[in-house]
């Protein structure tokens, strides 16, 4: 393909623009809402697995703060 060809350059620019736009988080206005809903669900699931939010943890880094049990807070450990 000859890149000095104006239609080819325009096609490449259009594809690049579309790919960049599709990867941008700001393009979808529903993402903050989805994150809020799914984040609340993940927090509740984490609390259930870990015997409560921030339960029985030596420090904040060992808690279920990232929505998964750590080696210090998992049941059965």
Curated annotation (Swiss-Prot):
Cysteines engaged in disulfide bonds, as pairs: 50-64, 57-69
GO molecular function: ion channel regulator activity; toxin activity
Leader peptide range in chain numbering: 1-21
Role description: Probable ion channel inhibitor.
Family statement: Belongs to the neurotoxin 10 (Hwtx-1) family. 65 (Jztx-21) subfamily.
Domain notes: The presence of a 'disulfide through disulfide knot' structurally defines this protein as a knottin. Is missing the last conserved cysteine.
Protein name per the record: U14-theraphotoxin-Cg1c
Taxonomic source organism: Chilobrachys guangxiensis
């Amino acid at each position: 393909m000859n890149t000095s060809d104006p239609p080819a350059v325009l096609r490449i620019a259009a594809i690049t623009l579309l790919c960049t736009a599709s990867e941008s988080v700001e393009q979808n206005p529903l993402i903050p809402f989805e994150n809020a809903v799914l984040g609340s669900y993940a927090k509740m699931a984490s609390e259930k697995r870990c015997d409560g939010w921030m339960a029985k943890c030596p420090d904040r880094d060992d808690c279920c703060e990232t929505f998964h049990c750590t080696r210090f807070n998992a049941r059965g450990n």
